[in-house]
Amino acid sequence: MFMSQFHATTIFAIRHQGKGAMAGDGQVTFGNAVVMKHTARKIRKLFHGNVLAGFAGAVADAFTLFEMFEGKLEEYNGNLQRAAVELAKEWRSDKVLRRLEAMLIVMDATHLLLISGTGEVIEPDDGILAIGSGGNYALAAGRALKAYAGEHLTAKQIAQAALKVASDICVYTNDCIIVEEL
């Protein structure tokens, strides 16, 4: 018997003018047909408020990864890059963890990283990342905003606007947007 999962979302993160911001929508979808929640929080502050982490994918899987990542942050005393690499190694090498269907974006005051279950830890050249069903729309909007209006907008404003664009296009992304800043 096939069991549907709770999933689909958009997470966008940007480093801009010395600040960091991460935005996520609030929609949780069950399977491909039913919106179960409109106001979910998919972004968390970790390690004494010094790290932001956002997830896209299956909710239960993402919570498992949040807990693991938080443990790695504690183990490596807040070293974001080391914690991310160690999580990715464990995620990829463990038979059970390898089946988790989620992705994470994590950031601190200096780094922005994508962590995937295939073992990738990627730091973007342009300081912008987006994941999830509306990720490509948010990424395009964020890049355009940073390139053409960046000197007039804050990181928080760009993150909010990029998610709004994604919510207008993607059926799995809503406009109940939560933005966190560092």
UniProtKB/Swiss-Prot annotation:
Protein name (Swiss-Prot/TrEMBL): ATP-dependent protease subunit HslV
UniProt organism field: Anoxybacillus flavithermus (strain DSM 21510 / WK1)
Family under the similarity heading: Belongs to the peptidase T1B family. HslV subfamily.
Chain sites annotated for binding Na(+): S167, C170, T173
Coiled-coil ranges from the UniProt annotation: none
Native organism taxonomy: Bacteria, Bacillati, Bacillota, Bacilli, Bacillales
GO molecular function, one term: threonine-type endopeptidase activity
Annotated CDD domains: protease_HslV (cd01913)
EC number: 3.4.25.2
Known partners and oligomeric status: A double ring-shaped homohexamer of HslV is capped on each side by a ring-shaped HslU homohexamer. The assembly of the HslU/HslV complex is dependent on binding of ATP.
